[in-house]
Amino acid sequence: MNSLAPVITIDGPSGSGKGTVAGLLARELGWKLLDSGALYRLLAFNASNHGVDLTNEELLTKLAAHLDVQFIAAEPGKLQQIILEGEDVSNVIRTETVGAGASMVASLPAVRDALLVRQREFRDVPGLIADGRDMGTVVFPDAPLKVFLTASAEERARRRYLQLKGKGEDVSLSSLLDEIRARDERDTQRAVAPLKPAADAIQLDSTELSIEQVLQRIRSEIAQRDLA
């Protein structure tokens, strides 16, 4: 960790495009990448691999503090790589089983505290792009550039629908919209680190913007701050 390394935080709700933007930006700048949303899945997956019960807060906290993980920004149009203990786990951590485990470990306060420390350890030269829901408000409140990326629930549901259909999955647009609205409510109303823009965040609505247009807006903010 290098506490002097610059950080650009990209927060926002599910389906806003923050993960895609963060990955492309990290690759473009040659900076480190943190996909904070994947950490709970990684912890649940790692715990299962090591035979640790998902209710054992003490052992989970130790695992969280020493997660050996690396995020590799992908080329345009491809998924980022997530390397855990030297193994590419990009696809296996996206299963429903791992997702359910992630929800269990995320409810444990000591685990959340340990992962907060672990997230801050990703800060290193030449810089870090941190993608999540509370990067600018909780994890890196001193970041020189904070972006809050959003889009209408309808547009986010449409994007998810096209993504899943492209994988051959049989999905309903209306059910996806219901899921996104329900998740938005949970994320914004939760007691710990609710989803909200930092007071000094640049807010971007990507509903009618392409990924390249969003990137161009962020590049402009980077140039104004002389960050890269």
Curated annotation (Swiss-Prot):
Enzyme class: transferase
Domain of life of the native organism: Bacteria
Keyword entries, A-Z: ATP-binding, Cytoplasm, Kinase, Nucleotide-binding, Transferase
Cellular component, GO, one term: cytosol
Gene Ontology molecular function: ATP binding; CMP kinase activity; dCMP kinase activity
Gene Ontology biological-process annotations: nucleobase-containing small molecule interconversion; pyrimidine nucleotide metabolic process
Pfam family, one: Cytidylate_kin
Binding-site residues for ATP, renumbered to this chain: 12-20
Primary location: cytoplasm
Cellular location(s): Cytoplasm
Catalysed reaction, written as an equation: CMP + ATP = CDP + ADP; dCMP + ATP = dCDP + ADP
Cystine crosslinks: none
E.C. code: 2.7.4.25
Gene3D superfamilies associated with the record: P-loop containing nucleotide triphosphate hydrolases (3.40.50.300)
KW Kinase (keyword) present: yes
CDD domains with a match to the protein in the record: CMPK
Stored InterPro entries: Cytidylate_kin (IPR003136), Cytidylate_kinase_dom (IPR011994), P-loop_NTPase (IPR027417)
Protein family according to the UniProt entry: Belongs to the cytidylate kinase family. Type 1 subfamily.
Cited NCBIfam families: cmk
UniProt-recorded name of the protein: Cytidylate kinase
